[in-house]
Amino acid sequence: MSFKDVTAKNFKGLKNVSLKKSMAMEGHTLVGTEARLGDAFELCESFSTSPSNIIEYEYQEEIRPFFQKAGLNKHSIGTHPELTGLGVGMIYNQYTVTMFVDIRKSSRLSLLLPLEQVYVVKNRILQACIDIVRALDGYPHRLMGDALMAFFGRSDVSKEDAIADAINAASTLRLILMDYIFPSLNEDIGEQIDLGVRIGLDYGAEDEVVWGNFGLGSFCEVTALGLPVDMTAKLQQLADKNTAMLGQGILDYIDFPEEYTKPKVKSGEELKYIIPNITNKEGQPINRRIRLLNMARYQELLPFKLNDKKMASAILYPNQFNFECFVIEDNKEVLYNSVSRFLPKKRRLTFKLSIYPGPGIGDLKIIFCKRNHGQEAKDDLSEDYSISIEDNKLIRVKNADNLSLLRKDGCYVLTVPEETLFRGLHTMEVIVRGNHETLFYRNIIGVYIK
């Protein structure tokens, strides 16, 4: 199933909502207060292709295999699963990655639809956001109107992997909302609603984050406290429409490459620090850095099918080539899906381009573009390997002594050996052209290294 199919099952026909009266609910007298609901209404959604409720876990079932995550994340909204036993007055230091997601211009729905339909549409969007966050091992914490707060990370997950999960969740949210859900709603409602999404992300270490049980008596909530957590809502507010704002905690901890970010520009000037730029106890501004995630560039790194991440339309033969990365673990070749997790240093990698012969696939010109980023890479930042294949024979053109071409199971496999050396995010891109420089295929794999 594709993202398009899942969205069609869950969002087509949202405009067709009828009402029927439900049984009146009896009121209950509380201390000093009388509560009575009277006549409630049950929404009966008449969908052309889906049942009355979103098919829970369908986005998860589509997304998780691409990130090599087993099973489903069935955690309910609320307390982080490791902290359910935290009593009132207790605190606990635990790192976390905090996410705030806000759906922009959703208030306009109230001007276009009856409120009953507005409820259904907004609820469906939030349900999808919850499932996408859970697909990347996030823990939805709280709903606030048309916004969602979530946490990533736990004691048995590395900090690096939690950050990668959060960034991947932000990029996947943007992809599915902007390219699938919002267009489906526009078509169904018959209006260009101009919905958008803004996301804030930041990481806080153990000494920066305290979890506590806040509240009184039965009115309690276990949540996180600390500057990185508190600032994430402000990051979301500063994010441009349809992108995510990354906080200093993420930028610094994994040495996230500037090439995959953009500056925040306000009134023609770059905004380098989160605003308001609060001061510390010495009265000095904290100057907490911010950068926008470059969604267009990072989206290309997601391990989804080319059609799903909107790359197939620019290439001629998306289905006659396949680009993969393998890591050697315990003397075995293990598939590593792009940006799916952080790898240790000193691991051998093999990039493989499979070429499936077919009509139109003749002689080829192939370039592998390696790009390292970050402080550890320093001068070792980029290298290109160029080869051509003529009459099914490999011709090495540039820096290609280590490349090899094998015939296997009816296809040709071109291999490029590499190694994990530098901390951060690094990429290998392949570009395949035919005669007259026609673009046959292009794909890119991101490798996170601890």
Curated annotation (Swiss-Prot):
Cannot be replaced by Mg(2+). Optimum pH is 7.5-9.0. It is found in: Cytoplasm. Mn(2+) 1 binds at D102, D146. Residues 318-450 are annotated as: AGS-C domain. Pycsar (pyrimidine cyclase system for antiphage resistance) provides immunity against bacteriophage. The pyrimidine cyclase (PycC) synthesizes cyclic nucleotides in response to infection; these serve as specific second messenger signals. The signal activates the adjacent effector, leading to bacterial cell death and abortive phage infection. A clade E Pycsar system. Belongs to the adenylyl cyclase class-4/guanylyl cyclase family. Pyrimidine cyclase subfamily. This is Cytidylate cyclase. It comes from Escherichia coli.
